[in-house]
Regions:
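Cytoplasmic membrane-interface "Motif A"-like loop-to-helix N-cap segments
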Residues: 78-99, 110-113, 328-368, 420-421, ...
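Transmembrane alpha-helix termini and helix-breaking/packing motifs in multi-pass membrane transporters
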Residues: 73-78, 105, 111, 174-197, ...
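Hydrophobic core of transmembrane alpha-helices in multi-pass small-molecule transporters
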Residues: 27, 93-146, 374, 385-408
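Loop-to-transmembrane helix entry
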Residues: 20-21, 50-60, 165, 197-201, ...
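A membrane-interface helix-boundary motif in multi-pass transporters
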Residues: 83-90, 166, 186-208, 300-306, ...
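Helix-loop boundary and gating motifs at the non-cytosolic
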Residues: 2-64, 258-294
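Central cavity-lining transmembrane alpha-helices of secondary-active solute carriers
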Residues: 54-79, 92-106, 172-180, 310-328, ...
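Intracellular loop-helix junctions on the cytosolic face of multi-pass helical membrane proteins
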Residues: 1-13, 116-122, 126-130, 140-148, ...
């Protein structure tokens, strides 16, 4: 039986500082994702890759999330490094991400060192760029998985919502920085110091961001150390790892399973929104609001991207504000056992205010319903302003979607680990009310955490295994990535039925005047509507989670 020894702690004199340091890696993760999602498609097209093949490349995202995060979670859960279970993998993966970003940005220059002829270098350049994208996707999923698990491992049950909220805040900051960096002419400001193009300079900045943000979190956090008994098997084969993942999926605790199913149905809706919102906004503009001269644009695709990005900046501002304000207005899942004592003068007011706060489940349900209401109106959008309004309405639901599942799963994992009532004692790190971490010391028999091997026990033991946050968050990510494959399948059918050819808004030759059909429903809007209906199912599944174990939700849904 393995044991966790030592003390988990976070540097910093105040709760705010500690939470920022704990979640700081999220800024680099989000910034890197944003640069990849925004700039890699035109970059691949510029290298000579066809659009159909480019779309296949982006299977890397959900594929890496489906495969890498659960495996990384299992490996990290059993890591016996003296530096802890999560941080060594975070650092190694961040280095791989940074190196791959540099390869991606300077692909032409690297290939030119080996292949001199321009035409002969095209295929090797494309191949190297595609490999770099896959490596970035796979490695950054490891950083993401370990950073989430680090929050769960380090914070007690009462602080799980706070930790998830701060991760959402750092994520929104990463998005804001990404939008700002992408909108600035870096060549004019920095010259050619970091590269000869905007994309090259952004990849260098992203590499610095992922390394720097990961280093800050790893420096600030001290983990418990996993100690294996003498003679115990130190590592598992890939087959054993996959068996453990499958076994854990089959024997998930009921409430964890309910959270996963709610996530599954909601992400069918979020996939269409996240991947197609910019294009939908641009197409709506060209279909209903663009003046005749705009329809004749030689760069309709570029114009569409800029128009969509301008609206998404407003959306990102709403997300940014919501990430800071909403957690203050929502009651923690375990707030009853962790209350700060306000001054007597305002104690009555604070008590009444806390009684009026909605809980996290209610907030998540409201987020589902608001998103569903907004996107169900997408097929009826007949103006760019109305489409922008609908997208902006999804800002707060997105904030909740990034925060609620992680917080709720963190609470459940902590309860499985004995972090709730009857669990280990806590020690305060400072005089400020806030973060209290488990007091787990070497030789303290009442505080040492023992880990059972999930492959060596009964079903009940598998369901209640402690300190397996890595594999649980990896499984949650499976329920996040599978809907992306479903969304791709749905979009393929809708596009083939409604817009089997080229998008009429992208014809670039005045499509409305040439008789190209634009009066029918927009195919992307139909995908958004289907996603809205799926999110209604997610709201129902989340409501079932409130009723108890949540078994009813997946008895009829999966």
């Amino acid at each position: 039986m393995a044991t966790l020894v030592g003390s988990a702690s976070i540097k910093g004199s105040t709760e705010t500082v500690r939470m920022v340091l704990l979640t700081f890696a999220t800024i680099g993760i989000t910034f890197t994702w944003g640069i990849e999602m925004t700039y890699c498609t035109p970059y691949l097209l510029n290298l000579g890759l066809t659009k159909s093949n480019t779309s296949l490349i982006w299977i890397a995202g959900p594929l890496s999330g489906l495969v890498v995060q659960p495996i990384a979670g299992v490996i990290a859960d059993e890591n016996t490094s003296k530096w802890g279970r999560r941080r060594p993998l975070m650092v190694a993966s961040a280095v791989i991400v940074a190196a791959s970003l540099l390869v991606l940005g300077f692909t032409r220059e690297i290939v030119a060192l080996v292949v001199a002829d321009g035409e002969s270098a095209t295929r090797p350049t494309i191949f190297l760029a595609v490999v770099a994208i896959y490596v970035v996707d796979f490695a950054i999923n490891v950083v993401m998985s370990c950073s989430r698990s680090l929050i769960v491992d380090t914070l007690p049950l009462e602080m799980q919502q706070t930790g998830a909220a701060w991760a959402s805040r750092m994520s929104s900051i990463g998005h804001m920085i990404g939008y700002a960096a992408g909108s600035i002419d870096l060549l004019q400001i920095l010259g050619t110091t970091l590269g000869d193009s905007q994309f090259q300079q952004l990849t260098v900045i992203a590499a610095i961001a992922i390394l720097g943000s990961t280093a800050v979190t790893c420096w600030a956090v001290t983990e418990k150390v996993l100690v294996m008994p003498k003679g115990a098997e130190q590592s598992k084969s890939i087959v054993q790892v996959l068996r453990q993942i499958l076994s854990t999926v089959r024997h998930l605790p009921p409430r964890v399973r309910a959270i996963c199913w709610a996530q599954f149905w909601s992400w069918i809706g979020w996939f269409a929104f996240l991947f197609y919102n910019t294009t939908w906004l641009g197409e709506t503009y060209f279909r209903y609001d663009a003046p005749p001269e705009a329809r004749q644009s030689k760069d309709a695709l570029g114009d569409m991207g800029r128009i969509g990005s301008a609206s998404l900046f407003v959306y990102s501002c709403i997300t940014f504000a919501g990430a800071f304000v909403l957690p203050l207005l929502v009651r923690s899942p375990d707030e009853g056992g962790f209350t700060q004592r306000p001054p007597r003068a305002i104690a009555g007011f604070v008590k009444k205010l806390n009684e009026k706060k909605p809980d996290l489940l209610t907030t998540w349900i409201c987020g589902h319903l608001l998103f569903a209401a907004a996107m169900s109106l997408a097929p009826f959008a007949r103006s760019f302003r109305f489409a922008t309004f609908l997208v902006c309405l999804c800002g707060l639901p997105w904030t909740i979607a990034m925060w609620a599942p992680s917080a709720l799963l963190g609470v459940e994992v902590n309860r499985l680990s004995g972090g709730g009532e009857g669990g280990s004692a806590y020690r305060r790190l400072s005089d400020e009310p806030g973060i209290e971490l488990p007091e787990v010391g070497v030789g303290a028999s009442d505080a040492t955490v023992y880990l059972e091997d999930p492959m060596a026990g009964t079903d009940a033991e598998v369901a209640s295994t402690a300190e397996l946050s890595g594999i649980y968050f990896g499984i949650l990510n499976i329920y996040t990535t599978l809907p992306q494959f479903c969304g791709t399948f749905i979009a393929t059918i809708v596009f083939s039925l409604l817009e089997p050819g080229k998008s009429p808004e992208l014809s670039g030759d005045g499509s409305a005047d040439k008789g190209t059909e634009t009066s029918g429903p927009n195919a992307i809007a139909v995908c958004l509507f289907i996603g809205a209906m799926s999110t209604v199912v997610a709201a129902f599944a989340t409501h079932k989670l409130r009723a108890g174990s949540g078994k009813g939700a997946f008895r009829i849904l999966g």
